[in-house]
């Protein structure tokens, strides 16, 4: 029986990549800086002391980090990672961006080698011609925002006006994204989704290569209690080249079970079943449940988004550390479900250093940890592209070769 469990710890970078200077990210180090803050008791909100992740250590995260940075994680010693059970290494990104879509597509063997379209202006971010087309087609009373913003902050600033006027809040960031925030009840979730779908069509028709249109629903009655809900939806471009998931379905009649926002990231392409799940607790338990029932030629593919969206972007070191420790506590259950012949792969899609300036992603190397009971444990080295993961999975399932990447086994 052949099964792959592919876990994306969204934003768990392990040190700035060689090209980080091009992104003003030299020195960024998501895992390293979290461990440092924990070690010096500067991340003690709802937790205390050094970062406690024994199961990630067992899979080789400390060795992976050390090989990426040349440094040792503060708060850990060499004895702790002496009994590693998985092969470990790290990878640099080939794609031109440091965003969710680029990272995930590349992991699946389809790197994005062109340039995304970015809305670079901090104010009046979206071209007036584009806004006019959207307003006209959707018969909107107007829009609010039209700027770079933090999603949690802009609803505090404009949420009340949005409720009064019915104007959706448009905003973006340094990533290739078009985000729309609307009140889930007053405006309506289905109306928000419909707007996002239409904007995706307009962008595609007008040759804007924008990675994602993101619905950002929120609830509350005023700026003091507005909160985003779990009903976010990402409407992505479709991958520009074939992924290992498509090959598995086409060549082996296999199944790809997408958990969390995975299906949205790939625009539903190469996905057999989409399971909606939000929050770290629910994502962990849904993943464990699906692992228990996974059949032959199946991939269980989960994105643990909270590391990025809840703690990374919000620069919450304590929250990120606490999240890692919770995930680690559930990781032991996942490891116990991996049988001989299975592949359990843990990696990330980019960095989002919670100690870094601003609120954006950081260009970093990512860990590659591969656990397969009974297989030889080895150092996987420095991989030049995340696509080595996709190629490894393709070879494991005896699929035709991917265009990008080299198998690690």
Curated annotation (Swiss-Prot):
Catalyses which reaction(s): 2-deoxy-alpha-D-ribose 1-phosphate = 2-deoxy-D-ribose 5-phosphate; alpha-D-ribose 1-phosphate = D-ribose 5-phosphate
GO CC annotations, alphabetized: cytosol
Pathway connected to this protein: Carbohydrate degradation; 2-deoxy-D-ribose 1-phosphate degradation; D-glyceraldehyde 3-phosphate and acetaldehyde from 2-deoxy-alpha-D-ribose 1-phosphate: step 1/2
UniProt subcellular location: Cytoplasm
Residue positions binding Mn(2+) 2: 308, 313, 361
Record GO biological process: 2-deoxyribose 1-phosphate catabolic process; 5-phosphoribose 1-diphosphate biosynthetic process; metabolic compound salvage; nucleotide metabolic process
Residues that, per the record, bind Mn(2+) 1: 10, 349-350
A Pfam entry, by short name: Metalloenzyme
Cofactor remark: Binds 2 manganese ions.
Family classification: Belongs to the phosphopentomutase family.
HAMAP family hit by this protein: Phosphopentomut (MF_00740)
Name this protein carries in UniProt: Phosphopentomutase
Taxonomic lineage from the root: Bacteria, Pseudomonadati, Pseudomonadota, Gammaproteobacteria, Enterobacterales
């Amino acid at each position: 029986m052949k099964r792959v469990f592919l876990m994306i710890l969204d934003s768990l970078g392990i040190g700035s990549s060689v090209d980080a200077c091009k992104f003003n990210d030299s020195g960024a180090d998501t895992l390293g800086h979290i461990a440092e803050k924990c070690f010096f008791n500067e991340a003690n909100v709802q937790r205390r002391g050094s970062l406690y992740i024994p199961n990630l250590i067992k899979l080789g995260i400390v060795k992976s980090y050390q090989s990426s940075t040349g440094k040792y994680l503060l708060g850990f010693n060499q004895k702790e990672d002496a009994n590693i059970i998985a092969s470990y290494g790290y990878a640099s990104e080939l794609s031109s961006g440091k965003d969710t879509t680029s990272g995930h597509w590349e992991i699946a063997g389809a790197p994005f080698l062109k340039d995304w379209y970015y809305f670079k202006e901090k104010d009046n971010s979206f071209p007036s011609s584009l806004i006019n087309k959207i307003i006209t087609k959707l018969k909107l009373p107007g829009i609010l925002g039209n700027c770079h913003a933090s999603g949690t902050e802009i609803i505090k600033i404009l949420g009340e006006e949005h409720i009064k006027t019915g104007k959706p809040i448009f905003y973006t960031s340094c990533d290739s994204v078009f985000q729309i925030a609307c009140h889930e009840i007053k405006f309506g979730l289905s109306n928000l989704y419909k707007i996002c779908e239409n904007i995706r069509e307009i962008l595609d028709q007008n040759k804007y290569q924008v990675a994602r249109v993101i619905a950002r629903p929120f609830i509350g009655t005023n700026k003091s209690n507005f909160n985003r809900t779990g009903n976010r939806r990402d409407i992505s471009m479709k991958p520009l080249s074939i992924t290992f998931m498509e090959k598995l379905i086409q060549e082996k009649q296999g199944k790809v079970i997408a958990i969390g926002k995975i299906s949205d990231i790939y625009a539903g392409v190469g996905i057999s079943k989409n399971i909606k799940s939000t929050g770290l607790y629910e994502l962990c338990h849904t993943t464990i449940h699906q692992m228990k029932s996974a059949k032959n030629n199946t991939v269980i593919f989960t994105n643990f988004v909270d590391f990025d969206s809840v703690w990374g972007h919000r620069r919450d070191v304590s929250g990120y550390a606490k999240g890692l420790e919770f995930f680690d506590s559930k990781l032991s259950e996942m490891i116990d479900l991996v049988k001989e012949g299975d592949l359990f792969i843990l990696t990330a899609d980019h960095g989002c250093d919670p100690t870094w300036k601003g609120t954006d992603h950081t260009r970093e190397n990512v860990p590659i940890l591969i656990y397969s009971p009974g297989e030889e444990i080895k150092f996987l080295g420095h991989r030049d592209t995340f696509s080595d993961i996709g190629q490894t999975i393709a070879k494991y399932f005896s699929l035709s070769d991917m265009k990008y990447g080299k198998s690690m086994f």
